[in-house]
């Protein structure tokens, strides 16, 4: 297993949970945070079963859950840990079926669910899980991670800005030039959105993100960072304060599964 980079503020809690793993744990990991890596740390030294969305469907189907439940009916001599990656991609019927496994605990079975957006999950599932919310890594951790790559200073600075606190994304941008170029465009668009007062131009820049929630969230994160940088450089004024409040509200809506198009359009209004 590759190195799992976690925030220092999460390390102690992960250690505590590891010493006494609950029946069901929900690991909430924002985009670019290594929720699956944390799950693997917690499941270490136990028989581990992995469940994730089918590539062709991008969801965890009810048939997958039924197969899991059938497997759980077999007697386990050793402790077994069921890791469900992208648990928020379970369909509603899948989650209802999964409730049976949560409601009928087996003393030798633990569940670790990893999710980016827990609000997509049923309250009845979430309420039966202990929650671990991962935090972004520090700038010092990010810089140390990038030292492993032979990048020029300009590229390193761009990656640190684009993927701040998200170690998996930092690795991806450092290792994949095409993905890096794609994300540099995010920064360009964010800068143009802040710079222009023309609604048509702003809307045109936003439109390319209507079909990609994760990129839309990253776009708003970058805009927020740019506004805060301007405030540090020139001081906060009513205009920047209004932009910050609006963008933060849009980012929150996107993370709560609001319609991407409608949420981003609020940046123009």
At which residue positions do the language-model features occur?
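Charged, glycine-rich active-site and insertion segments that engage polyanionic ligands
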Residues: 1-48, 108, 116-269
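Conserved alpha-helical scaffold flanking the Walker A/P-loop in AAA+ ATPase domains
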Residues: 12-17, 61-81, 89, 93-100
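Structural motif
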Residues: 26, 81-83, 112
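Glycine-/small-residue-rich active-site loops that bind phosphorylated ligands and cofactors
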Residues: 34, 56-57, 90
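AAA+/P-loop NTPase substrate/partner-engagement loops
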Residues: 46-63, 121
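Short catalytic-loop micro-motif centered on adjacent basic/acidic residues
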Residues: 83-84, 133
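Conserved Walker B
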Residues: 86-90, 118
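Conserved catalytic/switch belt of AAA+ P-loop NTPases
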Residues: 96-113
């Amino acid at each position: 297993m590759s190195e799992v980079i976690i925030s220092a503020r999460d390390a102690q809690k992960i250690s505590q949970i590891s010493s006494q793993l609950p029946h069901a744990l929900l690991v909430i990991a924002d985009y670019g945070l290594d929720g699956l890596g944390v799950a693997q740390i917690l499941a270490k030294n136990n028989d581990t079963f992995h469940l994730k969305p089918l590539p062709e469907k991008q969801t965890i189907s009810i048939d997958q859950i039924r197969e899991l439940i059938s497997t759980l009916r077999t007697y386990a001599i050793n402790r077994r840990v069921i890791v469900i990656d992208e648990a928020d991609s379970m369909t509603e019927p899948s989650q209802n079926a999964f409730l049976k496994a949560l409601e009928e605990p087996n003393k030798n079975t633990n569940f670790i669910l990893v999710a980016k957006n827990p609000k997509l999950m049923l309250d009845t599932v979430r309420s039966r899980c202990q929650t671990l919310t991962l935090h972004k890594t520090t700038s010092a951790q990010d810089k140390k991670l990038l030292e492993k790559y032979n990048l020029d200073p300009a590229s390193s600075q761009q990656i640190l800005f684009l993927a701040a606190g998200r170690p998996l994304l930092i690795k991806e941008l450092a290792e994949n030039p095409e993905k890096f170029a794609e994300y540099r465009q995010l920064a360009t668009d964010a800068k143009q959105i802040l710079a222009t007062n023309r609604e048509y131009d702003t809307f045109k820049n936003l439109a390319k993100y209507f079909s990609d929630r994760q990129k839309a969230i990253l776009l708003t994160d970058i805009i927020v960072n740019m506004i805060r940088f301007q405030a540090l450089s020139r001081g906060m004024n009513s205009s920047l304060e209004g932009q910050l409040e609006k963008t933060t509200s849009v980012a929150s809506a996107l993370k709560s599964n609001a319609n991407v198009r409608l949420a981003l359009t609020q940046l123009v209004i």
